[in-house]
């Protein structure tokens, strides 16, 4: 799997077990963020889950999700978090000099998740990373000591997690066509279910405290009110592109959304200020397949199998950032953790599917009853 994210003019790329970083407009090129050999064993937390007392042994570490801290506070820390196929969450801190160059990066903490992580995000204060996993559960982990708290559960795999800008709502997208909006940190209070998709919801983009966009397998781009998800406030039909949506990313300042599709070498840019929405197709130069996209400043940045492309939203001109041979080899061979997110419920396995669903419902109800008997945390 391969991911890209950005904070200011600094961009981070994760693919395989590599984490690279560069600055837009910097001639010094791409550099590794960390070396895995530098993990501090004393900062690797022991599993606290009954079903997972041993760390998962893997032939090769693979990064499954990537996030950067928000740095809302003046004293905010520059943190990068990744989840791996070892069922671990690693948090790193990096430090910059007066020229904004990274002078040091260090391992802060490693936590253990019960199932393979699928999505990760920092909460608004950067005190916790919130992680969704393949079993449908969501946990949060302290960046100070790695301690874990279970926050929520769903029937099916969590595919994306995101926060409203004020940090008061946690949103989850899952394989069962739902977007869920919950209060944070009191996630046992569910404000709304956004029900309108007919296939899995792969990706979320937050516009403001009451607006979220979602898309995925049904090729629709829906806009929802976070506090009232009774029906989409706006829907943009993307079926003409004949592919499921892989990723959306919003540039709030320019009021545009970038949309990537599965197995395509192009993206579209949706202008949110027009109604009906105007879309512009952008073919990524010298690229065979787009893997991820992020937004920062005046740019969309697209990660492909062989390129990193910076698109200037003022001019729509493309600039390709050079990548090293090692990263290029990993990107060219990268594979998704789950090949097919479409559900395959046939007559022969319907009863088994319903049984698993009922068992999951019961687990969620038990967890909810347990949470209701606890005092809600305000930290």
UniProtKB/Swiss-Prot annotation:
Cell location: Nucleus
Gene3D superfamilies (UniProt xref): YVTN repeat-like/Quinoprotein amine dehydrogenase
TM spans (from-to): none
Major localization listed first in the record, in broad terms: nucleus
Annotated PROSITE patterns: WD_REPEATS_REGION
Gene Ontology biological process terms, A to Z: tRNA (guanine-N7)-methylation; tRNA modification
Domain of life: Eukaryota
Keywords per UniProt: Nucleus, Repeat, tRNA processing, WD repeat
SUPFAM superfamilies according to UniProt: Tricorn protease domain 2 (SSF69322)
UniProt pathway: tRNA modification; N(7)-methylguanine-tRNA biosynthesis
One Pfam family it belongs to: WD40
GO CC aspect terms: cytosol; nucleus; tRNA methyltransferase complex
Ranges: WD repeats: 58-102, 112-151, 153-194, 196-234
Cell inner membrane among keywords: no
Function field: Required for the formation of N(7)-methylguanine at position 46 (m7G46) in tRNA. In the complex, it is required to stabilize and induce conformational changes of the catalytic subunit.
Family per similarity comment: Belongs to the WD repeat TRM82 family.
Subunit structure: Forms a heterodimer with the catalytic subunit.
Descriptive protein name: tRNA (guanine-N(7)-)-methyltransferase non-catalytic subunit
